Design a protein with these regions (language model features):
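Alpha-helical transmembrane segments of multi-pass small-molecule/ion transporters
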Residues: 1-338
Length: 338
């Protein structure tokens, strides 16, 4: 029993693979023609990823729970307003703990959409409002395609981000082309391939995780060649862990407080906490590749990678606590109006 309890706190296979890829890029970074090959392969993998997700997501899932507008507004406010405000407000206190480029990555983390898969998975584990979680998390990802580039220009660029394009409109256009267009084509192809994809979850998982690993390898290869680890001292990495921990603690605490303050039931609270406090690695890394210069992506996504692993481990424990609470509590009264 003790070994089983301890295993919940150990990194999963993907986390270990992610660490291995970062180590590989640090020791054997891709350069020259090899780097160009991996960049092209990464672009194709990202397009395939969004194509498959578009084909997997049903129109019913998109529309399910959409009438619960109070919950969705609160989740979107936490994702796209609360996080950027926290990032800017904490900068005078937490900024000196890390390098300016790393805190630019923290601000980029703050303007990203919520993660989809883990938010829904943790909501299910905790016995929360699943239809609302599917709707909120999916809508957050789609809205992030439009909102995140605008927030990057407002929040991140004034802090010194190295952007790859000369205008946010150009960045939005490239995100639409590389991310949204494959998603829409995939969704339009759903009548033809939707059932095939649903029966092959392992394929989607492989493409999902494989595309992230490719982006991480190419991003960190470019960053290492530009001297990433020489520019970031060990003290800054330790400071970054503290920054991510403080940000996650505040996000979890404030989403819980607001859910209870506005009178949501426990199922809705679970959805708000897990959808409103999480940030998407799957969306964030491709967006960083599009929005920022290649040599800057490694440092930009490092805070996101640390925050992502931290939120997975913390939310796994939190979801189990919610599940035990739901198992021992009486069934909640039905709500007459939403």
């Amino acid at each position: 029993m003790q070994a089983m309890a301890r295993s919940r706190f150990l990194p999963d296979n993907f986390t270990l693979t992610l660490v291995a890829v970062v180590t590989l890029a640090s020791l054997l970074p891709a350069s020259g023609r090899v780097a160009h090959f991996f960049e092209g392969l990464t672009t194709v993998a990202i397009g395939l990823l969004f194509f498959l997700h578009g084909a997997k997501l049903s129109r019913e899932a998109i529309l399910a729970g959409i009438t619960h507008w109070r919950l969705h507004l609160l989740v979107f406010a936490c994702t796209f307003i609360l996080f950027p405000v926290l990032g800017l407000a904490l900068r005078p206190v937490l900024g000196p703990l890390v390098t300016p480029q790393l805190y630019t990555g923290v601000l980029f983390l703050c303007v990203l959409p919520a993660t989809v898969q883990s938010a829904i998975a943790f909501t299910a584990m905790a016995r929360g409002n699943m239809p609302a979680a599917i709707c909120s998390a999916s809508a957050s990802t789609l809205l992030g395609v439009f909102i995140t580039p605008v927030l990057v220009s407002l929040v991140v660029l004034p802090e010194g981000g190295a952007v790859a394009s000369s205008s946010s409109l150009d960045a939005i256009g490239r995100i639409l082309l590389q991310l949204l267009v494959p998603f829409v084509i995939g969704h339009l192809s759903r009548p033809l391939i939707g059932k095939w994809i649903q029966k092959r979850a392992a394929v989607l998982k492989f493409v999902d995780q494989g595309s992230i690993l490719l982006v991480v390898y190419t991003a960190f290869s470019a960053a290492v060649i530009e001297g990433l680890w020489k520019q970031i001292p060990v003290s800054a990495l330790l400071g970054l862990l503290l920054v991510c921990g403080v940000l996650l603690a505040l996000a979890l605490g404030l989403t819980t407080f607001m859910a209870r303050r506005f009178g949501f039931n426990i199922e809705d609270e679970i959805t708000i906490v897990f959808c409103g406090s999480k940030k998407s690695l799957a969306s964030g890394i491709p967006m960083a590749k599009v929005l920022f210069a290649s040599h800057a992506v490694g440092a930009i996504v490092l805070p996101l990678m640390l925050f992502h692993q931290m939120q997975l481990m913390v939310c796994a424990v939190l979801a189990q606590r919610y599940a035990r609470r739901a198992a021992t509590s009486p069934a909640p009264a039905l709500r007459t109006a939403e």
